[in-house]
C-alpha cells in the first residue's frame, strides 16, 4: 500500500503494519497494561497492628458499664488503625510481545484510515525556539500533535517542551497511549521505515 507524504512523492509501505484491521479489544488491553505498568503502587496505610501504642487495654473487661475495649488502636476508635489498609502492590499486567506489536500495528492502521497520520520527509527546527516550532505547526494546521521521528532531535525536543498539546518521541519511545492521545501524529519517512522494521 502507499502512504501520501506532504510535499513529496507517496511511499510504499507494508500492508501488515499500516493496513490491518482495527482490533479494539487488543488495543484496549495494551493501553490498560501500559497504564497499569506506570502505577507506582507504593501506597501504604496502617492496620491496628501497625499503629504505635494500644498494648494496654483501656479499661477492665467487666464492671464498668461501658462497651468492651481491648485496645485504643481499634479501627473503631479515633486514632486507630485502618480496617482494610492499603498495602504496596505491583500493578503490572503481562502482555505478550506479539500482542503488544499487534496492538501498535492496529493503532497505526487506524491512524491511516482516519487521516490522523501526517507523513513528512523530514521535520526539524534550526534553533530550540518554541515560537519557531509553533509557527511551523500552525502553518501545517496542527495544534494537538505527537511528533515521531527515528531519533529525537535535541532542538525539536527543547522547542516542544513548553507546548501543552505537542509531544516529541522517537520510534522506540512511542507507546499505545501517546499514539492515540493526540488529534494528529506527525511522522517522518525514516520513522515509518523504522516502525516497519520493528513491527513487520
UniProtKB/Swiss-Prot annotation:
Any Pfam family from its record, for instance, is Ribosomal_L4
What are the protein's UniProt keywords? Ribonucleoprotein, Ribosomal protein, RNA-binding, rRNA-binding
Its protein name is Large ribosomal subunit protein uL4
Q: What does this protein do?
A: One of the primary rRNA binding proteins, this protein initially binds near the 5'-end of the 23S rRNA. It is important during the early stages of 50S assembly. It makes multiple contacts with different domains of the 23S rRNA in the assembled 50S subunit and ribosome.
SUPFAM superfamilies reported for this sequence = Ribosomal protein L4
Q: Which Gene3D superfamilies match?
A: 3.40.1370.10
Mark out the compositionally biased spans (Basic residues). 54-65
| InterPro entries reported for this sequence | Ribosomal_uL4 (IPR002136), Ribosomal_uL4-like (IPR013005), Ribosomal_uL4_dom_sf (IPR023574)
Q: Name one GO biological process term.
A: translation
The UniProt family comment states: Belongs to the universal ribosomal protein uL4 family.
> What would be the name of the gene that encodes this protein?
rplD
Amino acid at each position: 500500500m502507499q502512504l501520501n507524504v506532504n510535499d513529496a512523492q507517496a511511499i510504499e509501505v507494508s500492508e501488515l503494519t499500516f493496513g490491518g484491521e482495527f482490533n479494539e479489544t487488543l488495543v484496549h488491553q495494551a493501553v490498560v497494561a501500559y497504564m497499569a505498568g506506570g502505577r507506582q503502587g507504593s501506597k501504604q496505610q496502617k492496620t491496628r497492628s501497625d499503629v504505635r501504642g494500644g498494648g494496654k487495654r483501656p479499661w477492665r473487661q467487666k464492671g464498668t458499664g461501658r462497651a468492651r475495649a481491648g485496645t485504643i488502636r481499634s479501627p473503631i476508635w479515633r486514632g486507630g488503625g485502618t480496617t482494610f489498609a492499603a498495602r504496596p502492590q505491583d500493578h503490572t499486567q503481562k502482555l505478550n510481545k506479539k500482542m503488544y506489536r499487534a496492538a501498535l500495528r492496529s493503532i497505526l492502521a487506524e491512524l491511516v484510515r482516519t487521516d490522523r497520520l501526517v507523513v513528512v520527509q523530514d521535520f526539524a527546527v534550526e534553533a530550540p525556539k518554541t515560537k519557531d516550532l509553533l509557527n511551523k505547526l500552525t502553518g501545517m494546521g496542527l495544534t494537538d500533535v505527537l511528533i515521531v521521528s527515528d531519533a529525537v532531535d535535541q532542538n525539536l525536543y527543547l522547542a516542544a517542551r513548553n507546548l501543552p498539546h505537542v509531544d516529541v518521541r522517537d520510534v522506540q519511545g512511542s507507546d499505545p497511549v501517546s499514539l492515540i492521545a493526540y488529534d494528529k501524529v506527525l511522522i517522518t519517512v525514516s520513522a515509518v521505515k523504522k516502525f516497519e522494521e520493528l513491527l513487520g
